[in-house]
UniProtKB/Swiss-Prot annotation:
Keyword Lipid metabolism set for record: no
Entry binding sites for ATP: G44, P45, N46, G47, I48, G49, K50, T51
GO terms for biological process, alphabetical: cytochrome complex assembly
Protein's recorded name: Cytochrome c biogenesis ATP-binding export protein CcmA
Originating species: Xylella fastidiosa (strain Temecula1 / ATCC 700964)
Function: Part of the ABC transporter complex CcmAB involved in the biogenesis of c-type cytochromes; once thought to export heme, this seems not to be the case, but its exact role is uncertain. Responsible for energy coupling to the transport system.
Main location: membrane
Matches recorded under InterPro entries: AAA+_ATPase (IPR003593), ABC_transporter-like_ATP-bd (IPR003439), ABC_transporter-like_CS (IPR017871), ABC_transptr_haem_export_CcmA (IPR005895), P-loop_NTPase (IPR027417)
Complex and partners: The complex is composed of two ATP-binding proteins (CcmA) and two transmembrane proteins (CcmB).
């Protein structure tokens, strides 16, 4: 898994990040970067701090020390980061009493939409056209996961942070996610994704960051 050289500045660079909880070290010090067109895969067992790292990068938690540069800007605030980052947690983050299509329109109003994509197109991409008017609470777990992928496909953000995106996906869903990721990276986007075990195989430049217990 090797990355191709890039002359463009990194989409994200982290330097000496540390984080502790109740005086117990959880992360760090961590140093890494994500270039346009590549994926950084963060691997480590459950409880090692993968989700914590993503929340720090998304601006939802504060690191104890270290620096984060996003599009060369130093330690941007959470509202500024939302313009550059799409964060997909292990929870769907969907409105249960809205339809699948209404959810996508609602999220687009909050975060913006890729200029060449529409919610209806997104539902077609993930195979949910027939469920456009179905309330989210009536969708299966697999369908909710696909709707989350539709939300990701619509995002205009250049950097995607994905918390165990391959969890609970069937083979067709894995193929779909690989297609969405590959399309994003081929347009010089970047992604950081976490996995507790086996590494996903992507036809794009990738690097590995293996998290270990903080000293």
């Amino acid at each position: 898994m090797t990355a191709l050289p890039s002359s463009a500045p990194p989409l994200l660079a982290a330097h000496a990040l540390t984080y502790s909880r109740n005086a117990i070290p959880i992360l760090g010090p961590l140093h890494f970067h994500i270039n346009p067109g590549e994926a950084l895969i963060v691997q480590g067992p459950n409880g090692i701090g993968k989700t914590t790292l993503l929340r720090i990068l998304a601006g939802l938690l504060h690191s104890d020390s270290g620096h984060i540069h996003i599009n060369t800007h130093h330690n941007t605030t959470a509202p500024e980061r939302t313009r550059h980052i799409a964060y997909l947690s292990h929870l769907p983050g969907l409105k249960q009493d809205l339809s699948a299509l209404e959810n996508l329109h609602f999220l687009n109003a909050l975060h913006g939409c890729h200029p060449q994509r529409t919610p209806s197109n997104a539902l077609t991409i993930v195979g949910l056209t027939d469920h456009a008017q179905t309330l989210v609470r009536q969708l299966s777990a697999g369908q909710k996961k696909r709707l989350s992928l539709a939300r990701l496909w619509l995002s205009p953000a250049p950097l995607w942070l994905l918390d165990e995106p391959y969890a609970n996906l069937d083979p067709e869903g894995i193929t779909l996610l690989n297609h969405i990721l590959t399309t994003h990276l081929h347009t010089q986007g970047g992604t950081l994704l976490t996995t507790p075990g086996a590494l996903p195989t992507l036809p794009v430049p990738t690097r590995l960051l293996h998290l270990q217990k903080a000293p």
